[in-house]
Amino acid sequence: AMVSLPTYDPKRVAKRSDEDADAPYLNRVTQGMYPPGSTFKIVTLAAALESLTDVQQREFYCAGEMVVGDGTVTDNEGNGHGDLTLKSAFTRSCNLTFGSLALELKAARLKSKAETMGFNTNFLFRDLVVYESSFPDPESDYELAWAGVGQGKVLATPLHMAMIAGAIANEGQMGEPQLISSI
């Protein structure tokens, strides 16, 4: 949900908005493009569950960092999570597990799942402009690992990621946002 309740006089803002570096007319929910971060792990998890037959029975190990190509993927806690199941890796939001899953899935499979969940696709909604979320082709394994945790060059609107989260509660069906003026 998004709501606009300005605490200022919108007429005064209109007079100087062209000079404002904060872009007051940008609807950050539908047009702001940001790395989705850990919310993207939903996409990586869905791809792994569909493509890796034994993934739910596996154990993963998080040491806090892993070298991938010329870079290092780190976990947000720094010291690692130790042994994890897939469920606990998702619950703890383990970057190493999801980076490893992205590498195992390969770029084409992860990108395909991202696209089935709306990345690289124009959303056409009545009365609502939503910018296209982007999952570009990773140029290295390092980029792919970070893409699997929603970092690097992956960009999404907050509305798109909310729609993906909502699909979990809606038996996998992504709902269409509605613009309303009152409840």
Where are the regions a protein language model picked out?
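Beta-lactam-recognizing serine transpeptidase/beta-lactamase-like catalytic domain environment
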Residues: 1-38, 43-183
